[in-house]
Amino acid sequence: MDPKLEERARELRTLLQKASIAYYVHDAPILEDSVYDRLYRELQELERAYPELVTPDSPTQRVGEKPAEHFPTVFHRIPLYSLENAFNPEELEEWQERLLRVLGRAPVPDSRTEGELEYVCELKIDGAALALTYIEGLLERGATRGDGQAGEDITPNVRAIRSIPLRLATADPPPVLEVRGEVYLALAEFERINQERRSAGDPPFANPRNCAAGTLRQLDSRVVAARKLSFFAYALHWPEGWPAGDPPQTQWQCLQQLKELGFPVNPLSQVCRGLGEVIQFYERWRGAQLPYASDGVVVKLNSLRLQEEAGFTQKFPRWAIALKYPAQEVPTRIRAIVASVGRTGAVTPVAELEPVPLAGTLVSRASLHNADRLRELDVHIGDTAIVRKAGEIIPEVVGILKELRPADAVPYSLPSQCPECHTPLVRPPGEAVTRCPNPECPAKLRGQLQHWASRDALDIEGLGEKRAAQLVESLGVRTVADLYRLTPEQLQGLEGMGSRSSQKLVQAIQRSRQQPWERVLYGLGIPHVGVVTAQILAGHFPTPELLAQASAETIAQIYGIGAEVAEAVVAWFAEPAHRRLLQELQALGIPALPQQENPAVSQILAGKKFVITGTLPTLSRQQAKAWIESRGGKVTASVSRQTDYVVVGSDPGSKLEQAQQLGIPLLTEAELLALDPTVESGDLHP
């Protein structure tokens, strides 16, 4: 190989990469399009003639020649959380009050003008979330958000997005770097694509978000390249010890770091001091003409240390919220009203509508919430209703145009009997919801089976809405325990179930016997007990018996569990039917428990804050974190004056030096375990 050809290929790659960063990141092109295209073709011809010159980060390698057959599922090392929504400044202020309580700070006298907290405001782009992983500076993987825990590996399509760098713009890349951001479609490009689809006789896309999300899942990356998706980065996760010197301490510094690495960052982002400046930012951009679709403002606590202290709920980071623009409202006619029964027996009136486009989707159903709301609105079948869709919530009826009410409009009120099982409905004292009290109501049974089989519970593949209905209606399944008595022969009698599919479903059901207690607890569907709450409760009460015997006062004292949850748990276990169900499940070996049951773990570390640095002798970092948190402690990512202990292993990072400077006590792994005198030698279980 001629060294001059190698050098020329390297020069072309470097120049084209710099040109892409200048164009997409800094909005300051250094090459005319025609010049870029000519240089690109020169590199392409060189690589075609000499394939050994091709490198993974070459601009020519963005688009593959062969369509993918499928997208494999990948698990996110760091979950992608959703954002809590606020729909007006008042809800934003309520969020800040909750945040201040979590951080242990005094309320702000005038939260709009004298806020002591500093925030970063970023426009909320209406697109699709993307998780990028770089290994030694090269793009290794791009994945969709999915359910936040697992998504689809769409790396070939990610490589086709010109604004996403294939190589980080740094001479000192970390071993692993994760970047999060939003893929979106510029409005002009969206219009061009839809015009092409109309000309071809294809239906147009409803909105840019749907088009962007659908494009990401195209099996042919050439289609992705042709649609010219764009990307804004907004978060990164880096390993300890990188970058050299001072790592980012704030969200704003993270955004600047992303730009330095070659990622496009929305230039309209801004640091705001207090909610007053946040609301000014929101008002400035609400209704503004932008080159992309935006449905609100994302407000993030600027300090990464305070973000760490605030932590997460089951679904959201406590330190961030989306302040959404006012919801879109449209009028349409109510064709009928039906009463829908959920798994807890809650009866919700639902309006069936003349289909109407709303917020990019075709809406044909909308919630009327409850009996009080029905009376307040004075809803009639045949009325013209005002329907609103705010964010990702289901559409709701917010008003009735009574002046348009036809003469034959029919008043509606909730039935007195359950529409599914005809049991008289009840309204518990103090509740707005009307419920069906029948434990054998088919609608409740269907919902309970679906919840039990859901991914975060027992994770039974193949047991969805349709199959749950068949099991209840055709096979007489009445409790989740009945699932474990089903045979392939019984299932083969159901519509759509053959020999193979019946065998697979029975195997999936039987495999779920091995799921741990925390998943079973979540699957029981106890009110207010979500995934995270179930994990906390299972950590403190390692068997169903221990939890069933606990008082509301005992449960409420656990860090992260409040009185409302505690009372709901005690009330659930007090029901004879629920106790019988647990006995049935335990007779079936559910949940799978260790041979020797652990006693309830003490809370000896309650209120203490720990930082872990280096590699511990026997515990992984995750195991050490779980051990500390199960005893009431909290593990944070950075050392501060509020840190009580730093646990030090081999090859510690800069946190050790920081702890020594601040005079914070240092612990070995053995000294950490010795903090709990109830732990016997060799017992390292959380």
Curated annotation (Swiss-Prot):
Pfam families the UniProt entry points to: BRCT (PF00533), DNA_ligase_aden (PF01653), DNA_ligase_OB (PF03120), DNA_ligase_ZBD (PF03119), HHH_2 (PF12826), HHH_5 (PF14520), Nlig-Ia (PF22745)
SMART domains assigned to the protein according to its UniProt record, in alphabetical order: BRCT, HhH1, LIGANc
Annotated ranges, domain BRCT: 600-686
One of the protein's GO biological processes: DNA replication
SUPFAM superfamilies named in the record: BRCT domain, DNA ligase/mRNA capping enzyme, catalytic domain, Nucleic acid-binding proteins, RuvA domain 2-like
This protein's GO CC annotations: cytosol
Catalytic site positions: 124 (n6-amp-lysine intermediate)
Positions that bind NAD(+): 33-37, 82-83, 122, 145, 182, 300, 324
EC class of the enzyme, as a word: ligase
Sites where the protein binds Zn(2+): 418, 421, 436, 441
Keywords: DNA damage, DNA repair, DNA replication, Ligase, Magnesium, Manganese, Metal-binding, NAD, Zinc
The enzyme's E.C. designation: 6.5.1.2
The UniProt record lists the keyword Manganese: yes
Keyword NAD: yes
Cofactors named for this entry: Mg(2+); Mn(2+)
Domain of life: Bacteria
CDD domains per UniProt: BRCT_DNA_ligase_like, LIGANc
Catalytic reaction(s) noted: NAD(+) + (deoxyribonucleotide)n-3'-hydroxyl + 5'-phospho-(deoxyribonucleotide)m = (deoxyribonucleotide)n+m + AMP + beta-nicotinamide D-nucleotide
Molecular functions per Gene Ontology: DNA binding; DNA ligase (NAD+) activity; metal ion binding
PANTHER family reported in the protein's UniProt record: CHROMOSOME TRANSMISSION FIDELITY FACTOR 18, DNA LIGASE
Its job: DNA ligase that catalyzes the formation of phosphodiester linkages between 5'-phosphoryl and 3'-hydroxyl groups in double-stranded DNA using NAD as a coenzyme and as the energy source for the reaction. It is essential for DNA replication and repair of damaged DNA.
Recorded family membership: Belongs to the NAD-dependent DNA ligase family. LigA subfamily.
Name of protein: DNA ligase
Organism: Synechococcus sp. (strain JA-2-3B'a(2-13)) (Cyanobacteria bacterium Yellowstone B-Prime)
